[in-house]
Amino acid sequence: MVKIRLRRAGRKKLPVYQIVAADARAPRDGKFLEVIGHYQPTAKPHAITLDKERVAYWLGVGAQPTTTAHSLIRATGLLHEMNMKRKGRSEEEIAAEMEQWQARQNERREKRLAIKTRRRQAKKAAEAEGQESA
């Protein structure tokens, strides 16, 4: 069985992962069939690059993504795009839907970032207030 999974590269404490198609019996960093993308978790925001045609090919021939690889593929919108193609939508409809999808993802990302910054500011204010009263 072929799996789409992550293969660790990079140096100590600075991981970079290759997204590969590999035999399920092969070790994590061992033999693989093809590199189909890269993932840099330490970049802000996380950097994901995929060869969409090759990912679609491997999924089409029955490769099973691991949970992490599945979430990375989903984050790029490839699964949504493949699902629309499977349903028989035209290229124009797919392009329009993908633009809307990308806009929604950007809004969500900005909203999460705003919440995070508000929490940090509130925490700093609480710490400053606690130090003043002490």
From Swiss-Prot:
An individual GO BP term: translation
Location of region: Disordered: 105-134
One Gene Ontology MF term: structural constituent of ribosome
Keyword Ribonucleoprotein: yes
SUPFAM superfamilies, per the entry: Ribosomal protein S16 (SSF54565)
Record-linked Gene3D superfamilies: 3.30.1320.10
Entry keyword Signal: no
Biased composition (Basic residues): 114-123
GO cellular component terms, A-Z: cytoplasm; small ribosomal subunit
Alphabetically ordered keywords of this record: Ribonucleoprotein, Ribosomal protein
Family: Belongs to the bacterial ribosomal protein bS16 family.
PANTHER family tied to this protein: 30S RIBOSOMAL PROTEIN S16, SMALL RIBOSOMAL SUBUNIT PROTEIN BS16M
Record protein name field: Small ribosomal subunit protein bS16
UniProt lineage: Bacteria, Pseudomonadati, Chlorobiota, Chlorobiia, Chlorobiales
